[in-house]
Regions:
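A short, acidic, flexible beta-alpha connecting loop/helix-capping segment that sits on the rim
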Residues: 182-193
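Acidic/histidine-rich catalytic cores of soluble enzymes
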Residues: 57-163
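Short beta->alpha connector loops
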Residues: 3-9, 31-32, 100-108, 163-164, ...
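C-terminal helical cap(s) of enzyme catalytic domains, especially alpha/beta-barrels
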Residues: 192-209
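H/E-rich (His + Asp/Glu) clusters that bind or coordinate divalent metals
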Residues: 167-169, 180-183
Length: 209
């Protein structure tokens, strides 16, 4: 489950609820940059993540972090995402790696999966076309006018219709023992409906197995 930071701060109440409904993973889906390395709320965030990890363990779940591309900005020569995983031990924080944003951030997704072998629980399979720039995050929001503008230069695609090398991503995921791979496409594209995009991704995966 993707659970907003504000909900995680409620502590036992939130974690017990998700445990009671059978969740295995509780995921930090997004955090403002002020909470990451170099930000004024970074120390506070790291301490809270440790508490969240302990609570997840208490209730029989694992805490994961879902990345975007801004975690691939550097502070003192290191990526913010690497500094996060350095600060929080693997028993308290696992990885839900979004391969689209890894690529947009400038790294090879398969290589980055292998970098965190033993910590990767979930891999998001997400394809895209276009280049980094503009308001890419409008595509994961609710403002239709912004979505249309952003889609002009960058769009999410059904698997196999964009720039990603999924055979290498899937091979790396298998090598490191990822428990789940999840197809994700935030918005439909290519003139297709949501269900048509899902069908295209399913058929693509069938074609490479």
């Amino acid at each position: 489950a993707h659970v907003p930071y504000a909900e995680l701060l409620k502590g036992d109440e939130t974690f017990k609820t998700y445990s009671d409904i059978g969740c295995k993973y509780i995921v930090i889906p997004w955090i403002n940059e002020e909470y990451l390395a170099g930000g004024e709320k970074n120390a506070e965030f790291y301490e809270n993540v440790k508490k969240f990890g302990e609570l997840a363990n208490k209730y029989g779940m694992k805490l994961c972090y879902h990345n975007h591309d801004f975690e691939f900005k550097k502070v003192d020569g290191e990526y913010k995402i690497d500094l996060l995983y350095k600060a929080i031990s693997p028993d308290l924080l696992s990885t839900q790696l979004d391969t689209c944003w890894v690529n947009v951030g400038g790294e090879n997704p398969a290589d980055f999966i292998r970098k965190y072998a033993g910590r990767i629980e979930i891999v998001h399979l997400k394809d895209f076309a276009g280049t980094k720039g503009g308001n890419m995050y409008a595509l994961i929001g609710n403002d239709d006018s912004k979505k249309e503008a952003a889609a002009g230069s960058f769009e999410f695609r059904p698997l196999g219709s964009g720039l990603q090398d999924f055979p290498s991503i899937l091979e790396a995921s298998k090598e490191v023992g990822a428990h789940w791979v999840v197809v994700e496409q935030d918005e439909p594209s290519m003139g297709k409906s949501r269900m048509e995009c899902a069908e295209m991704s399913i058929n693509y995966l069938k074609s490479i197995f």
